[in-house]
UniProtKB/Swiss-Prot annotation:
Source organism, top-level taxon: Bacteria
Pfam entry (one): ACPS
Enzyme class: transferase
Function statement: Transfers the 4'-phosphopantetheine moiety from coenzyme A to a Ser of acyl-carrier-protein.
Protein's UniProt name: Holo-[acyl-carrier-protein] synthase
The species this protein was found in: Leifsonia xyli subsp. xyli (strain CTCB07)
Amino acid sequence: MIAGIGVDVVDLARFGRSLARTPALRDRLFTEAERGLPVHSLAARFAAKEALIKALGGSEGVRWHDLEIVSDEERNPAFVLRNVVERQALERGIAHIHVSMSHDAGIATAFVVLERDS
């Protein structure tokens, strides 16, 4: 059963300028494992984090490091949740988080579907 859906888009050029103008932003938004990725990958991950927050219904108490995107052996993205976000997902009975990210034509986008078992 679908429990939530979220989508977000990020302008790559604007996001890149923001990271260049405010170097601390990279540290604030991304975990240590994510920070070394290229700007287009960071923008897609930021869009995915925003989409997950929308799917959960809000960002109260959420810290950006509570949401991390990792890739499996086949480079499929998946979330690692911590702290407040992990508790929110457990309280809502979220069994699966599906995430899709892409970037093209100067835009990064992400789509998240939250699923309960029944």
